[in-house]
Amino acid sequence: MQRLMMLLATSGACLGLLAVAAVAAAGANPAQRDTHSLLPTHRRQKRDWIWNQMHIDEEKNTSLPHHVGKIKSSVSRKNAKYLLKGEYVGKVFRVDAETGDVFAIERLDRENISEYHLTAVIVDKDTGENLETPSSFTIKVHDVNDNWPVFTHRLFNASVPESSAVGTSVISVTAVDADDPTVGDHASVMYQILKGKEYFAIDNSGRIITITKSLDREKQARYEIVVEARDAQGLRGDSGTATVLVTLQDINDNFPFFTQTKYTFVVPEDTRVGTSVGSLFVEDPDEPQNRMTKYSILRGDYQDAFTIETNPAHNEGIIKPMKPLDYEYIQQYSFIVEATDPTIDLRYMSPPAGNRAQVIINITDVDEPPIFQQPFYHFQLKENQKKPLIGTVLAMDPDAARHSIGYSIRRTSDKGQFFRVTKKGDIYNEKELDREVYPWYNLTVEAKELDSTGTPTGKESIVQVHIEVLDENDNAPEFAKPYQPKVCENAVHGQLVLQISAIDKDITPRNVKFKFILNTENNFTLTDNHDNTANITVKYGQFDREHTKVHFLPVVISDNGMPSRTGTSTLTVAVCKCNEQGEFTFCEDMAAQVGVSIQAVVAILLCILTITVITLLIFLRRRLRKQARAHGKSVPEIHEQLVTYDEEGGGEMDTTSYDVSVLNSVRRGGAKPPRPALDARPSLYAQVQKPPRHAPGAHGGPGEMAAMIEVKKDEADHDGDGPPYDTLHIYGYEGSESIAESLSSLGTDSSDSDVDYDFLNDWGPRFKMLAELYGSDPREELLY
């Protein structure tokens, strides 16, 4: 078999060499080949071009121009001229017009343009007419291996999990060779790692893989790989290398360990359950997202006393009490804690020795408030009992001092004023309780810590006390609702008037039975239905409205409680007129049906009369006091309250009070003593020497009044012991040239001097003041 295979390979090689030789021979003289292939036969052929494409190698090293090929027709003419048309004519190619030879006038690069499409034209030199139809042809540029591979990026970034298995793909890089991939190995690329080959390898496809499983992010987080690309002939250049940066992805492959072996905390005993009392810190080389530390208490008797929660933000362990701390019970807690990571497979890794630590928690004493023995109290009490012991609450001081405790009921409690609590915590009711009024009472009892003197220390606790009032059969049955029965005056025997039912304010059991009895003899019959209802029917029939319009039926209702209670409820039955169909046509008004009692009417009238008498007494008392004050005033006091209405200005200043004793003394000539003042000394104006009186026939004028005022003013100004007199009033002069003249009562010397006012004395005591004011001649009584 081996010999057969070798024979076949040798035969194939020989055939290949023969084919290459044939191609070379054909290409050595293409023009000649074309010419021979297109020689005319015995029959006449149409003239036509004898070529279709040309070939040339890129980047020839010979001098320009480079001969590409030759264009010619099957029929030669001496006056023929060859032309080229196309985009690259004159720039890249030209043609010899006489011979048809095509030349490249610049070096060609296949990587830029691999084919050129031109048009060949043959024309007559003289006329310029086309001798042949223009023909398009192609010039193909043959590739040579003149380019080296170039990476698509100079820098690649990749990542791979740490501790990955050997052969794990990291990244694929690509380098591109611009040469023709169809020609030999011109475009084939080969890769190799120049830097980082200790940890990574690359295959010919550009895929980089790991060759070791000892990649540890905690030791080295990044790796730099330099990759080289070259073609099959070994062409390399500056662009033939690239850098790959490989970042190791962290995995949770490290156990946490404590930063110290012993933690000590001091915690007050009043620390609330669930609050932090301390924190435990560990180190974990992994990245934060892979730090999943779990803390647990290993040894000790206090596993149920504390819990350790993990704070994800800082990976710390927060110690929290699970039940209240009590210094009087335990002063110190000591236990061992362990920090582990449950996501790490313990089959491949074992935790380090530093993942355990000792925790010591010292409890400090705090003055705590009293503690009740129960979270709440529930007591029961029968209603209508007179101040029995309801129950006892008890609180104790949890501290070692064991202070005494005082109790009180908060006044904000529900009806707390009905109860009291003693120093021992006994609760009593202050009044009888009625379940039908309040079936439940909710009290808040305070327990206050007292010092040796009995003064509260400020520490207090409260507890809720629920008092349930138990029912007794202390209420008689009554109608279930108000009834307003009616009956026709022509009602017949046995006619149903009303069905009644009863209720009881007490708690009624399911077997409660009410018994109904009609207690009086009348025209009605009561029939007990034995289902807690009863029927009222007409006994004889035919009522007389003229005699009785309303009938009162006292119904006695009793229950079967222990003891039994009996009550009487009255039905007010109105006798109405009815038509033939038995429909009510006229009944008495509601007031008559209800039948307001005489006692109620008398009570209402007495209330109205009492209110009226009280109102009259108040009015008369105020009036008598007003009259007493009016009659008890002296003449100067009356003068002090007189208001003059002929002043044209001043507003309310006209009613300013002033001491009129001075004017009175002037008017009386000093004979009448002035009104006593608080000061024993007489008024300043009473001490002033008065001007001499005028003759009886003389008349005082404004000038004399002004002179007197000036004298008084000077004396007041020079009197250092007297109070200032800042307000001066002139009443005798009210202006000049007034048509109505003066209306003032003080200026009557010129208007009513001849009027006799003695008749005022005959008008009685009500005009006594006017008689004193006007009963004498003003010119003799007053001095202006």
Curated annotation (Swiss-Prot):
Transmembrane segments: 600-620
Keywords tagged on the record: Calcium, Cell adhesion, Cell junction, Cell membrane, Cleavage on pair of basic residues, Cytoplasm, Glycoprotein, Membrane, Metal-binding, Phosphoprotein, Repeat, Signal, Transmembrane, Transmembrane helix
InterPro entries (UniProt xref): Cadherin (IPR039808), Cadherin-like_dom (IPR002126), Cadherin-like_sf (IPR015919), Cadherin_CS (IPR020894), Cadherin_Y-type_LIR (IPR000233), Catenin-bd_sf (IPR027397)
Entry comment describing in which tissues the protein is expressed: Expressed in endothelial cells (at protein level). Expressed in the brain.
SMART domains: CA (SM00112)
Residues binding Ca(2+) 2: E58, E111, D143, V144, D146, D179
Binding-site residues for Ca(2+) 1, renumbered to this chain: E58, E59, D109, E111, D146
Annotated Cadherin domain residues: 48-151, 152-258, 259-372, 373-477, 478-593
Extent of the signal sequence: 1-25
Membrane topology reported for the UniProt record: Single-pass type I membrane protein
Modification note: Phosphorylated on tyrosine residues by KDR/VEGFR-2. Dephosphorylated by PTPRB. O-glycosylated.
Proregion residues excised on maturation: 26-47
Gene Ontology terms describing biological process: adherens junction organization; bicellular tight junction assembly; blood vessel endothelial cell migration; blood vessel maturation; calcium-dependent cell-cell adhesion via plasma membrane cell adhesion molecules; cell migration; cell migration involved in sprouting angiogenesis; cell morphogenesis
Residues listed as glycosylation sites in the UniProt record: N61, N112, N157, N362, N442, N523, N535
One GO CC term, this protein: plasma membrane
PROSITE patterns, alphabetized: CADHERIN_1, CADHERIN_2
Subcellular location: Cell junction, Adherens junction; Cell membrane; Cytoplasm
Top-level taxonomic group: Eukaryota
Residue numbers binding Ca(2+) 3: N145, N147, D177, D179, H186, D231
Free-text note regarding domains: Three calcium ions are usually bound at the interface of each cadherin domain and rigidify the connections, imparting a strong curvature to the full-length ectodomain.
Function: Cadherins are calcium-dependent cell adhesion proteins. They preferentially interact with themselves in a homophilic manner in connecting cells; cadherins may thus contribute to the sorting of heterogeneous cell types. This cadherin may play a important role in endothelial cell biology through control of the cohesion and organization of the intercellular junctions. It associates with alpha-catenin forming a link to the cytoskeleton. Plays a role in coupling actin fibers to cell junctions in endothelial cells, via acting as a cell junctional complex anchor for AMOTL2 and MAGI1.
Subunit structure: Part of a complex composed of AMOTL2, MAGI1 and CDH5, within the complex AMOTL2 acts as a scaffold protein for the interaction of MAGI1 with CDH5. The complex is required for coupling actin fibers to cell junctions in endothelial cells. Within the complex AMOTL2 (via its N-terminus) interacts with CDH5. Interacts (via cadherin 5 domain) with PTPRB. Interacts with TRPC4. Interacts with KRIT1. Interacts with PARD3. Interacts with RTN4 (isoform B).
UniProt-recorded name of the protein: Cadherin-5
Gene behind this protein: CDH5
